[in-house]
Structures are given as structure tokens and as C-alpha cells.
């Protein structure tokens, strides 16, 4: 028993727990559950990269960054029997989650608290946060998990860490956030809100709770973080610009962009009513239920599906829509009622907020802890309301907000167990 404790408390033991427990959980799920894609978007990416549609890999697919699609397409050429796009998602999630848990163990060791704290945090996170994305793969959520790992790594960095450790942290954050951006750009924007909070947290603790550091070192630390964020943003958008430039040379991509302009303008979220209950509106433009269902499957070959009919449907629906507040409340209510997972996760965030600020936080720093918690949970609430207002609130969008908020709060829980920063 003593030998086991010695192994667990060693540096190798922390790596073993972080990666081993995650691997065990993944193995059990993959062996006992059917893994599938949550939406058709990922299926289309996979078909293009694997060459199922054309006979050869097509990395210019609209939903994926060109520089991410090329290596996956090459792997399909070398070993076409393996599901490389699915493997990418699983490996990206596994590595990101393991790194986050490794940060938990590092913080526990630095604070000299019981190993039970990070173990419980890891098990809770795996069971209640990361199992759904594993069995129902979606590139929005994979991008979120990649980016969240950078949020946790940055938030767990200590000013007393070795220079080599800090270099590794910056390098990992850069790669993880770049991959997150390349996997799904839209989820990257919400991730960057939480990453910015992690960076501000690092800067604030440097000025407030590191009296041994000179003013010059504090300014240098701030400059490093700001320079890193600027370089990251420039790199991400630079890669995106080049990717779009290459992809737009393809006639197929140009044709898709033309079609997508119609889809976004007329048939995107909240821009048209369901067929049931609105038969008169659709019959007025010679649409039956089959025509309507064809548009849901992105099939636009019917001659009755044209700019005139789409405009008629959209304008009629927009004229009868409820107020912005009513629409926002309705979308959030539907999300709450449709998924018990949402109810439990919101309750867990509230409990963590209460425990952090009333039970864990030290009195002399309680105001700072409360402020950080409010920024995290308040940012989560604001982004949730924004998505509800825009009508873009499926489960995957909610997960893109929940995961970084939950993991950031868990990181703060481990950081605030001790007065030392």
C-alpha cells in the first residue's frame, strides 16, 4: 500500500493518473458504446477527406481548414481502411483532457493537498462533461475541448514555475488554440473569451499577490502574455486567410459558396417555420412536405426552391416572429426542457461558484475570487443569452460554453485551496 502511495505521489504517478484514467475511461466507452457523428456536417467532412464522393481526398471541403484537411486526407490515402477523421477527433479530445487533468495534479502537488481532490475532479469531469462528446462526435465540441485545454493550462501556470515549464505552456497553448481554430472557427471565438480571462487572471495575480517580483518583471510578464495573444490571433487568421484563398480556387468550392449564401440568408437557424402548422405558407410557393424536407437535407435541385420562394417564406416568418426577449427566453427554455444534462450542468456550475467563494476562498482574497468567478460565470451567461437571441442554441453550442466555464472553475477550485499563488 505504501508503495502504491509513493508511486501515485511521484511525478510519473501524476502522468499515469492523468493519462491512464482517461485512457481507461475512453477504452470502456469505445468498447461498449456506438460512436457516431452528432450532425451531417462531420459526415460530409469525412466523405470529402476520405474521397468517398469523388474517389480522392478533397481537403478544400467548406467546413474544415485546408491545412488540417491535407494531412488527414494523406492518411486516408495511405491507410484508407482506418477512420482517420474520427481518430483525429478522439485523439484530440483524449490528449486535451489528459493535459487538463495533468494540470489538476500539478496544482494539487504545488498546494500540498490530498491527491483525492484532483482524482475526484478528473472522474467528475470525465463522467459528466466529456462522455457525451465522445459518443456523439461533433467538430464544434472537439474544437472547444482543444481550446479549453489551453484555458486550463494558462490558468494553472504559476509565477514560480521554471522558465522551461513556461515555454512549454506557451507552446502548448499556441498549438491547442491554433488546432481549435482550424477545427471549428465559431467555437474558437467563445474559447478566446475564457482564454482572455485566464490571461487577465495571470496578470492580476502577478500585480496583486507577488510582492517579491520587481515592477520591471511584472511589466515584462504582462508584455509576454499580451504579445503571445496578439501573435496567436494573427497566426490563426493568417492561416484562415491562406486556407480560404486556396479553397476558393476550386470551382466546387465557389459553387458551394454561392449555394451557402442562399442557405445562410434564407434557411439558417430561426429563419423559416416548420412545415407542420404552416402548410398554407409553403403551398403558396408550390412546396409540399417533401420539398421542405429536401431543403433540410441541403438538396436544392427542385425548381420550386428558388430565391423568390425562399424570400417569400423567410419574410412571412420574420413578420410574425416574437420579440427579441421572448425569442431568447423561448430558445433557452427549450434547451433546458429538452436535455436533463443541461439542468444538471447548470446546477453544478452554481454549486462550484458557491463552494469557491463561501468555503474555499481566503477572506483576504475573497473579493478577488468573487470577481474572477463572476467574470467566468457571467461571461458564460452573457454568451448563452447571445446564442439564445441569435437562435443558435443546439446542445453543441451550449457545450462550447459549458466546457470552458466548468473546467476554468475547477482549475480555480484547486488554485484557491491554498493561500499561495
Where are the predicted features?
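Membrane-proximal stem/loop segments at transmembrane-domain junctions that anchor or position
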Residues: 244-330
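Transmembrane-helix motifs of polytopic, lipid-linked glycan transferases
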Residues: 91-111, 353-360
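Extracytoplasmic loop-helix module adjacent to an early transmembrane segment
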Residues: 18, 22-62, 72-77
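Start-transfer (signal-anchor) and selected internal transmembrane alpha helices
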Residues: 1-28, 115, 203, 217-232
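Short hydrophobic alpha-helices at membrane interfaces in multi-pass membrane enzymes
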Residues: 112-119, 153-178
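Membrane-interface alpha helices of multi-pass inner-membrane proteins
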Residues: 168-187, 196, 228-238
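Short hydrophobic/aromatic helix or loop-helix immediately within or flanking a transmembrane segment
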Residues: 58-92
Amino acid at each position: 500500500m505504501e508503495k502504491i502511495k509513493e508511486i501515485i505521489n511521484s511525478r510519473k504517478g501524476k502522468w499515469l493518473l492523468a493519462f491512464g484514467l482517461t485512457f481507461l475511461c475512453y477504452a470502456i466507452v469505445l468498447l461498449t458504446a456506438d460512436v457516431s457523428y452528432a450532425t451531417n456536417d462531420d459526415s460530409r467532412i469525412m466523405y470529402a477527406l476520405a474521397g468517398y464522393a469523388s474517389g480522392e481526398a478533397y481537403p478544400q471541403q467548406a467546413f474544415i481548414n485546408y491545412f488540417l484537411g491535407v494531412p488527414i486526407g494523406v492518411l486516408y490515402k495511405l491507410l484508407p481502411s482506418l477512420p482517420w477523421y474520427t481518430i483525429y477527433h478522439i485523439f484530440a479530445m483524449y490528449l486535451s483532457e489528459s493535459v487538463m487533468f495533468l494540470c489538476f495534479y500539478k496544482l494539487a502537488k504545488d498546494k500540498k493537498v490530498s491527491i483525492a481532490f484532483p482524482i475526484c475532479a478528473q472522474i467528475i469531469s470525465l463522467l459528466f462533461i466529456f462522455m457525451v462528446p465522445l459518443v456523439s462526435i461533433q467538430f464544434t465540441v472537439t474544437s472547444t475541448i482543444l481550446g479549453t485545454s489551453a484555458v486550463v493550462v494558462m490558468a494553472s501556470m504559476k509565477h514560480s514555475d521554471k522558465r522551461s515549464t513556461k515555454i512549454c505552456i506557451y507552446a502548448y497553448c499556441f498549438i491547442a488554440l491554433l488546432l481549435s481554430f482550424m477545427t471549428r472557427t465559431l467555437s474558437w471565438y467563445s474559447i478566446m473569451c475564457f482564454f482572455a480571462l485566464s490571461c487577465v487572471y495571470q496578470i492580476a495575480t502577478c500585480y496583486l499577490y507577488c510582492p517579491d517580483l520587481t515592477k520591471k518583471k511584472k511589466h515584462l510578464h504582462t508584455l509576454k502574455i499580451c504579445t503571445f495573444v496578439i501573435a496567436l490571433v494573427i497566426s490563426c487568421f493568417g492561416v484562415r486567410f491562406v486556407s480560404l484563398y486556396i479553397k476558393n480556387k476550386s470551382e466546387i468550392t465557389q459553387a458551394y459558396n454561392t449555394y451557402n449564401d442562399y442557405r445562410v440568408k434564407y434557411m439558417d437557424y430561426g429563419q423559416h417555420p416548420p412545415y407542420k402548422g404552416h402548410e398554407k405558407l409553403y403551398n403558396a410557393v408550390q412546396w409540399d412536405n417533401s420539398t421542405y424536407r429536401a431543403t433540410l437535407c441541403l438538396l436544392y435541385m427542385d425548381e420550386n426552391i428558388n430565391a423568390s420562394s425562399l424570400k417569400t417564406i423567410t419574410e412571412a416568418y420574420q413578420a410574425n416572429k416574437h420579440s427579441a426577449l421572448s425569442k431568447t427566453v423561448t430558445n433557452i427554455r427549450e434547451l433546458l426542457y429538452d436535455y436533463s444534462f443541461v439542468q444538471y450542468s447548470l446546477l453544478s456550475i452554481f454549486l462550484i461558484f458557491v463552494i469557491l467563494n463561501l468555503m474555499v476562498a481566503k477572506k483576504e482574497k475573497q473579493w478577488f475570487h468573487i470577481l474572477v468567478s463572476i467574470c467566468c460565470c457571467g461571461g458564460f451567461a452573457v454568451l448563452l443569452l447571445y446564442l439564445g437571441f441569435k437562435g443558435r442554441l443546439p446542445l453543441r453550442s451550449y457545450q462550447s460554453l459549458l466546457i470552458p466555464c466548468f473546467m476554468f472553475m475547477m482549475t480555480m477550485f484547486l488554485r484557491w485551496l491554498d493561500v499561495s499563488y
